[in-house]
Swiss-Prot record:
UniProt organism field: Drosophila melanogaster
Pfam families tied to this protein: TGS
Protein family membership: Belongs to the mitochondrion-specific ribosomal protein mL39 family.
Assembly and binders: Component of the mitochondrial ribosome large subunit (39S) which comprises a 16S rRNA and about 50 distinct proteins.
Cysteines engaged in disulfide bonds, as pairs: none
Protein name: Large ribosomal subunit protein mL39
Ranges of residues in domain TGS: 56-122
Locations listed in the record: Mitochondrion
Keywords assigned: Mitochondrion, Ribonucleoprotein, Ribosomal protein, RNA-mediated gene silencing, Translation regulation
Any single GO CC term annotated in Swiss-Prot or TrEMBL for this entry: mitochondrial large ribosomal subunit
GO molecular function: nucleotide binding; structural constituent of ribosome
One Gene Ontology biological process: mitochondrial translation
Broad class of the protein's primary localization: mitochondrion
Length: 333
């Protein structure tokens, strides 16, 4: 048996033989480097909270049902979710994203910096484009976590990146690298990946955002070849800052925003895996694609089947092997 064939079987079997169900904070990708990445995330999160110092009161003018109301909150501490807690339990459960001053999408768990108007967005608003885009982006982020959970360490899976959301394309995507050029997952393997997405949704994991300096991001991702290569270009476009997101212990790079929790993922299918380019003498880039509905949305089997078939078509997004500097909307979307 050739080395390439052995690698192929390793990655294939690694996906078929899924790790046992893990707790919220213990994905199968856990390792010393992952633990350190999370430690650094936690330390920086605490440092930023402690650096707030004197707490300034801000006025948040909530616009929406049941009525407009002004809330007095704590600047750089209170979040849109905290505002929702002052309104009702329903607002907390339904609000996927916030809109600040009528135009700025804002993560539900991101501290508000100054007085503003606030709208809480769900998937039933009259103009859902903004929240749908955040949902699509979150699906790609969750797919990275699901892939880490599904593949055993010996498969040597490496997450590359996920393109910005393109709802018209019919699929959300995540690009990966495997040390085999012959991976062709079957229905069983794709169902296993879909099941990992469903598990993430059931865990109702809060999605956290953290803006950090490039040097800290480099330290966090120093064991990730592709993330390390991408960070300088990202920070050049964002004044030396890098935006990170975390669910459970899975951390990745994205400018966001994303929806508040994994629980907003409803019916979901990981539908396709396309080899898009070779990487080195034995590896290859693969684009994993899927389609999903927000939780609470119902679609009959036939209609969802049409969406699933459409999502299998190769995504037109820029390919992961193209120079990162040219990918205008890749990780920065």
């Amino acid at each position: 048996m050739s080395a390439a064939t052995k690698l192929h079987k390793t990655s294939w079997c690694a996906l078929r033989q899924l790790q046992q169900y893990r707790t919220k904070a213990n994905f199968s990708g856990s390792s010393a480097s992952l633990a350190k990445r999370n430690d650094l995330f936690n330390q920086e999160q605490r440092r930023q909270r402690d650096a707030v110092g004197r707490i300034d009161k801000i006025e948040v003018r909530y616009l929406g049902l049941p009525e407009d109301v002004t809330l007095v909150m704590n600047g750089n501490i209170s979040t849109p979710f905290n505002c929702a807690q002052h309104l009702s339990e329903g607002h907390c459960k339904r609000s996927a994203l916030a809109l600040i001053d009528g135009s700025v999408p804002w993560d539900m768990h991101r501290p508000l910096q100054e007085s503003c108007t606030l709208q809480l967005l769900n998937f039933h608003v009259s103009e859902p484009h903004v929240v749908n885009k955040a949902f699509w982006r979150t699906c790609s982020f969750m797919l990275g976590a699901a892939l880490n959970r599904a593949f055993k360490p010996e498969a040597n899976l490496q997450l590359h990146s996920f393109p910005g959301p393109n709802i018209k394309s019919g699929s959300f995507v995540h690009d990966i690298v495997l040390q085999t050029q012959n991976w062709e997952p079957g229905k069983e393997e794709m169902r296993a990946l879909s099941a990992e997405m469903v598990k993430l949704a059931a865990q109702d994991l809060r999605i956290e955002r953290l803006d950090v300096q490039q040097d800290l991001a480099q330290e966090m991702f120093k064991d990730s070849k592709y993330k390390s290569e991408q960070l300088p270009s990202i920070s050049q476009q964002t004044n030396g800052r890098v935006t990170l997101y975390r669910l459970g212990d899975h951390i990745d790079i994205s400018r966001g925003p994303m929806v508040a929790s994994t629980s907003f993922l409803g019916k979901c299918v990981i539908s396709a895996a396309h080899k898009v380019a070779e990487e080195g003498p034995s590896g290859a880039f693969y684009r994993i694609q899927g389609v999903a509905l927000p939780s609470g949305f119902q679609l009959n089997h036939v209609a969802f089947g049409v969406l699933e078939e459409r999502s299998k078509k190769p995504s037109p997004a820029r390919l992961p092997n193209e120079p990162f500097e040219e990918q205008q909307q890749l990780q920065l979307s």
